[in-house]
Amino acid sequence: MTLPVLIIGAGLSGLTTARLLTNAHIPCIVFEASPPSRTQGYAISLRDWGFNALLRALGNLPLSSLTRAVAPDRHIGGWGWLDQSWRNNQTGEIIMMPPKESKEKPTILRANRNALRQWIADAGVGEDEEIDVRYGHRLVGVQLLREGGDGNVVTAEFANGATYTGSLLIAADGVHSTVRTLILPAVKPEILPVLVYHGDFKLSREEYECVIRPHAGESTIVAGVGDGFNTPLTVCDVTSTTVHMDWTYSRPSIGDNDPLYNPNITSEEAKVIPEALIEEINAKKLGEPWSLFLNGEAMRRHRVFNWLTRCVSMERSDVNSCTGKGVVFVGDSWHAMPIFGGEGGNHAIFDGIELAKMLEVAWGRSKEDVQAAIGKYYDKSWRRCNDAVRRSKQRFYQLHRPISEWIEIAEKQKMRA
């Protein structure tokens, strides 16, 4: 009996890989440290090159099958449209307004992350094609390519005492990858000198229609730019009675004495709202709708997190050495990029598509053929992913430019129109 592929992590890259392997009748098991109830209810932006590739890989599904399942506003007939206009977050004035995209052929759309993960997991080709996900399995050890009765196998050991053997181990466990830490301890995430504060809150549908709709219309995001800082308001999920939303306050660090930047902050400290943050935001004199939610009184009622911005890059020699030991990386485990301005979710999905495609061709052949297939996966994805990490760092600063530069860009666009 063929040993399964062991996939560590039930995020976008892990579930995409597992779904496509399962559809191809390649046995695999996904191990997730969190319980089934874990939530990642915020929304992400999906690019056309990412969601179109996924739809093709799943059997040329129509775009509507995706948007009806994952759009933050799906329950009220929306399709995840986002207005890509940039507004001055003090005056509300539109600085730049690209043409509105059509529902039939968008270049970008918003997706609720929880709903997207569930949709990928459920996108099987038949009733017997359910993904095998084992929750509550936190990886603590790996044994790589030992000789056994079934040939070369990898072994994964978990904190609950469970042990599984497989033909291949896929590291899909994110920026804090346990797999990477165990076998490539010298590769550590880089913390960027930027700050990103994120607040979650809820509105009633009546409040949403009254205070957000006049500014956002049908858009699931209201992008606000200031003088070197950003304050987007985003819709995460809409029901008949409640709207889940979040705000982000982000800017580059202002040096060694920045009271809001602490690269050594603990997870518990990251949940505390610093008074310096409230003072700084109040001093910005934001206009509506941002001022309604980014103010001291409102923020104290929200769940607020200080998100450290981490990036991960690896050398080709690192991944090559792991391939020979039966390990392959997908998603943020080997190319993490900033949440703000990055496209990590899209690249995670694309990794899963590319790897599954290569493994499907080589499956059932020799170990050398499988390793050659993994090499082709890296050949195809290496430049894409490394360039994306580099661009994402640059993009953060481009999106946090002085307001005078935003206005100058807008004026030049008007002259060219």
From Swiss-Prot:
GO biological process, any: asperthecin biosynthetic process
EC number(s) on file: 1.14.14.-
Keyword Chloroplast among UniProt keywords: no
Pathway: Secondary metabolite biosynthesis
Signal peptide (UniProt feature, chain positions): 1-18
Amino-acid positions noted as binding FAD in the UniProt annotation, renumbered to this chain: 32, 43, 117, 332, 345
Chemical reaction(s) catalysed: 3,6,8,9-tetrahydroxy-1-oxo-3-(2-oxopropyl)-1,2,3,4-tetrahydroanthracene-2-carboxyl-[ACP] + NADPH + O2 + H(+) = 2,3,6,8,9-pentahydroxy-1-oxo-3-(2-oxopropyl)-1,2,3,4-tetrahydroanthracene-2-carboxyl-[ACP] + NADP(+) + H2O
Top EC class, one word: oxidoreductase
UniProtKB keywords: FAD, Flavoprotein, Monooxygenase, Oxidoreductase, Signal
Induction section of the entry: Expression is induced during late sexual development in the dark.
An example molecular function term from Gene Ontology annotations: monooxygenase activity
Cofactor(s) this protein cannot do without: FAD
InterPro entries to which the protein is assigned, alphabetical: FAD/NAD-bd_sf
Record's keyword annotation contains Cytoplasm: no
Effect of deleting the gene: Fails to produce asperthecin.
Function: FAD-dependent monooxygenase; part of the gene cluster that mediates the biosynthesis of asperthecin, an anthraquinone pigment. Polyketide synthase (PKS) aptA catalyzes the formation of the aromatic polyketide from acetyl coenzyme A and seven malonyl coenzyme A molecules. Polyketide is subsequently hydrolyzed by the action of the hydrolase aptB into endocrocin-9-anthrone. Endocrocin-9-anthrone is then oxidized into endocrocin by the monooxygenase aptC.
Family: Belongs to the paxM FAD-dependent monooxygenase family.
Protein name (record): FAD-dependent monooxygenase aptC
Organism: Emericella nidulans (strain FGSC A4 / ATCC 38163 / CBS 112.46 / NRRL 194 / M139)
